[in-house]
Amino acid sequence: SSKNNLWTLAGVTLGAFLGNEIGASMDKTDILMAQNARNYALENNKVNSQAAWKNPDSGNSGVIYPTKTYSVGDQPCREFTQEIIIGGKIQTGYGKACRMADGSWQLQ
């Protein structure tokens, strides 16, 4: 589906974070806002410091916070927790990402 393609484009594997019901309820703006919050949190936030997003059009929102910082070789990496709230329902996901040479964060 186009929603799953958007998740792939956003660098998020749908199944790794969100159930299909929640993912199917997110629009392109939600996905991009969640991605931007995730990238900001991974780059800038201390462990357990949240980055939040809220789409005023859809009413959907979420938070992401790093839970651990570590290295793989020369790459800084972080574990994180992400909570997406759609229609009052919270879906929690966990992930790991490492910073690439170009400064982007790649999910592991």
Regions picked out by a protein language model, each given a short descriptive name:
Residues 33-94:
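Amphipathic, membrane-inserting segments
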Residues 86, 101-102:
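Short, intrinsically disordered/low-complexity patches at protein termini
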Residues 102-108:
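Short beta-strand edge/turn micro-motifs at domain boundaries
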Residues 95-101:
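Short beta-strand segments and strand-loop junctions that repeat across beta-rich extracellular domains
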Residues 1-43:
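Short, low-complexity, glycine-enriched hydrophobic/amphipathic alpha-helices that associate
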